């Protein structure tokens, strides 16, 4: 189940995602390989990134690889509501709303982690930080993850 601002925004988001797929083909070769090999079959991936068309495409590629993808924004001010609605429309569990409060943002992250992911793709370290604290009970299946930013790495090192 997704939490997005307004599902009626999906057509605009679908257009943006299609533009990325048409004019930014870097992931298309990987997607073709994933479609055949299904390297993530049986795995659940929680993805926290700037929720816009390019990163939405990454979520779709991971899904083609067999993953059960759960997508959220890593910054409530960068989340594009139409793209979030489009991903929900496409069947990807999406938790993202532009302009939410800090508490609402954390609640969306928690909703994302309720999938009990095997893998995490994080930008800023918010998902991984929650698994090390408030949501420790949701990380029992976790086998790996990646953090995009130096800031996120520093946050995680500080938790040691």
Question: Can you annotate each of these PLM segments?
Answer:
Residues 1-160:
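N-terminal ligand-binding/catalytic initiation module
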